[in-house]
Amino acid sequence: MGAYIMRADEMAKRLMKEDNQLKQQIIEAFGDQSYNTDGSLNRGYLAREAFENNRVQELNALVHPHVRQATREEIKNAEKKNFELFVKEAALLLQHDRPEYLDIIVLVKADPEKRIQWVAQRDGVAPEQVRARMQWQQSDQSMEQMTDYIISNDGTINELKTKARKLIEELKASES
């Protein structure tokens, strides 16, 4: 497909580890315990602070501007490398407004219980922790209003890939 894929969650984790300005902002806001003695991010501590002490918006306000800037840089890199398509995978993409730097937004929807199961398994956390995180996310209905296309992830991974490829082909055909 020639797609450049950027995963915002991975980008945020990398920036929180490597971006010295962001690290300093996090330490100032959340304390030295935000990072382990080896300099690695203390994800457990930050997750507890954010989700149990209602500081999610505070953490997001620090991290998201850095992710947006990194996204713009990634888009430029993808263009230089002649990728046909730039894909940003981001659960929190539409938290505030529709990003002006993206031409088309596709919402991939799945049953909430399936999402909880997938994230719990991926992150090695309890389903209750995932539910608490999801409470900070916008509802599917509000996100649907800001998207151009919706893909239902109600089958296998291969079925999802087929749906995505079909949409990409439709978009390419409409450009011609």
What is each model feature region?
Residues 1, 23-27, 112-117, 127, ...:
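An amphipathic alpha-helix signature
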Residues 1-7:
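A conserved segment at the C-terminal end of the G1
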Residues 9, 59, 87, 151, ...:
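Residue-level signal for inorganic ion chemistry
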Residues 71, 100-101, 121, 125-172:
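Small-molecule kinase domains that catalyze NTP-dependent phosphoryl transfer to phosphate-bearing small molecules
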Residues 72-80, 85-122:
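ATP-dependent NMP and nucleoside kinases share a basic, alpha-helical "lid"
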